[in-house]
Swiss-Prot record:
Region: Disordered, residue numbers: 15-43
One of the GO biological process terms: spindle attachment to meiosis I kinetochore
GO CC terms of this entry: CENP-A containing chromatin; kinetochore; nucleus
Encoding gene per record: moa1
UniProt source species: Schizosaccharomyces pombe (strain 972 / ATCC 24843) (Fission yeast)
Basic residues bias (residue ranges): 15-30
Name of the molecule in the record: Monopolar attachment protein 1
């Protein structure tokens, strides 16, 4: 019978404490051991010898860079680079004339491009607001399309040094 009483006691203790080896009396009187201080730190961090390298003994003043004004920069933006290095003579050869479509193009309509009898349509007729000042002998070479193409190429060549994508360049 003694065995049954011990088993009953253990069962009751397990129900109460969930740990049969620690009784209520031991649990109340036992104190938890202090956590071990692995750094051996007894002073504040800035006075502790174990952490002497955290903060420098002398604080150096960090100077912020001065703000540059417009006078500090060179005229062309950056030294050695001239961003607006385009051939401006192309603009002087082209003169704006009108903002509407020429009447000759309106009369023929889209059949103008499908008609086999038309050998060559000057580019200046298709560009409504640009008139070419060159002679008619050199109209194919010096047309508005030719100037726009060379202007586009010069813009792309100029901006190629900046690794700009073609989609980002606004073409006129």
């Amino acid at each position: 019978m003694a065995i049954n009483n011990e088993n009953e006691l253990e069962y009751k203790l397990i129900k109460k404490n969930k740990n049969p080896k620690i009784s209520n009396s031991k649990k109340k009187n036992s104190t938890r051991p202090a956590l071990q201080d692995k750094t051996n730190q007894t002073l504040p961090i800035h006075q502790n010898q174990a952490f002497s390298n955290i903060l420098p003994s002398d604080f150096s003043i960090i100077k912020t860079p001065e703000t540059k004004t417009a006078d500090d920069f060179p005229v062309n933006g950056y030294e050695g680079l001239n961003i607006l290095k385009f051939d401006l003579e192309l603009f002087y050869k082209l003169k704006p004339v009108a903002t509407s479509t020429p009447k000759s193009c309106m009369r023929t309509g889209s059949n103008l491009f499908l008609n086999e009898t038309v050998k060559h349509v000057p580019d200046e007729r298709l560009v409504s607001n640009i008139k070419n000042t060159q002679t008619k002998d050199s109209i194919t070479r010096d047309s508005a399309y030719y100037h726009r193409k060379t202007m586009t190429e010069s813009i792309i060549k100029t901006l190629a040094a900046f690794d700009a994508e073609v989609d980002e360049i606004i073409l006129f």
